[in-house]
Amino acid sequence: MKLHEYQARDILARYGVPVTGGGVATTPAEARAIAEQIGGRVVVKAQVFVGGRGKAGGVKLADTPEQAEQVAGQILGMNIKGLTVEKVLVAEAITYEREIYLGAIMDRASRRIVMMASAEGGVEIEEVARTNPEAIVKVAAHPMLGLLDFQARDLAYGIGLTDAKQARQFAQIATALYRAYMDVDASLAEINPLVVRADGSLQALDSKIVLDDSGLFRHPDLEAMRDASDEPEAEQRAREAGITYIKLDGDIGCMVNGAGLAMATMDVIKLYGGEPANFLDIGGGASKEKVKTALQIILSDPNVKAVMFNIFGGITRVDEVAKGIVAALSEVQTNVPMIARLVGTNEEEGRRILAESALIPAATLAEAAEKAVHAARAG
């Protein structure tokens, strides 16, 4: 679950990260009131879950409260990469001499939380990793002891913060970011940029936190921050139904039970020259209603030219899945060809149910993938 910038900065501020003054506004009048409280120059920033806000006109400076009101009126309601701006962050605009990147992320290879810093702040860290990987300094936090003081200082020295006072403040901010990351069950937390002001002090200008959905049951206060308006309708519907769904760029819809089997299914589709349109795991013990909802979600993607079912019935009963597919097809009028490979518990009954439909049967995963790719190309 993604948090907006204003939500992330509020969390980091509670941990002692120095942030600029400001607040969130939903109307131009609210933006003016916040600018009046700040006094002086402000920056008005669109709050949407996409990058490139500045290039799209979603970040503007204002010298007066009147200007802030005018600028907010221009940004609110703006469409940025398909998302409508409903909130803006009005924050103090400051001058600075240098931009730094600081982030925390899970490194699955080492199974540690890795803290990263770079002297090349203000740009996407992925771009820095591609063009100048030597500019990124990393330390792995101890799983029991956490981020140690000397590691935080090593990050500071590694990006050229050699002044003792400056390095000490950076270490404090890095430790605060790490603590926030751990406490809120984040999968990503970053400050970009963390700027160096003329007096040598550090201040966070932009921040980002992505929460691990699996940990949200521990944080009802954070769950309440979810902004469904910026979540694609299909993903929102899938989440509410307990279905794991991620839209991709291909044209072959996939419905599978089990994350590992779903990834293997996508691999085999690509092996036969196709492109998956989605990752969809209906989970174990899927009911008829859940299967019906999953199929409706898949077919809501206009790019889908074929649908492939790959169900291995252990906990999940194949006949229940078959009933769900037939029920969905009775409600959704579609000419999209569908290929089904269903094996396991009650598979004979499941195949009997599907035999009365227009689905194309397949005995193996390879056969199903090959037929799905052929059907998508023919469509």
Swiss-Prot record:
Q: Self-association or partners: how does it assemble?
A: Heterotetramer of two alpha and two beta subunits.
Function of the molecule: Succinyl-CoA synthetase functions in the citric acid cycle (TCA), coupling the hydrolysis of succinyl-CoA to the synthesis of either ATP or GTP and thus represents the only step of substrate-level phosphorylation in the TCA. The beta subunit provides nucleotide specificity of the enzyme and binds the substrate succinate, while the binding sites for coenzyme A and phosphate are found in the alpha subunit.
Q: Which pathway does the protein contribute to?
A: Carbohydrate metabolism; tricarboxylic acid cycle; succinate from succinyl-CoA (ligase route): step 1/1
What Pfam families does its record include? ATP-grasp_2 (PF08442), Ligase_CoA (PF00549)
Task: Write down what this protein is called.
Answer: Succinate--CoA ligase [ADP-forming] subunit beta
**Which domain of life does the protein's organism represent?**
Bacteria
Q: Does the keyword Nucleotide-binding apply?
A: yes
InterPro entries associated with the record = ATP-grasp, ATP-grasp_succ-CoA_synth-type, ATP_grasp_subdomain_1, Succ-CoA_synthase_bsu_CS, SUCC_ACL_C, Succ_CoA_ligase-like_bsu, Succinyl-CoA_synth-like
Catalytic activity line of the entry = succinate + ATP + CoA = succinyl-CoA + ADP + phosphate; GTP + succinate + CoA = succinyl-CoA + GDP + phosphate
Where ATP binds, per the record, is at: K45, G52, R53, G54, I94, E99
Q: Name one GO biological process term.
A: tricarboxylic acid cycle
Q: Which gene encodes it?
A: sucC
Q: Which family does it belong to?
A: Belongs to the succinate/malate CoA ligase beta subunit family.
* Residues covered by the ATP-grasp domain: 9-237
GO molecular function of the protein, one example?
A: ATP binding
Q: What is its EC number?
A: 6.2.1.5
- Write the record's keywords in alphabetical order, separated by commas: ATP-binding, Ligase, Magnesium, Metal-binding, Nucleotide-binding, Tricarboxylic acid cycle
Q: Does the record carry Manganese as a key word? A: no
Q: How is the cofactor bound?
A: Binds 1 Mg(2+) ion per subunit.
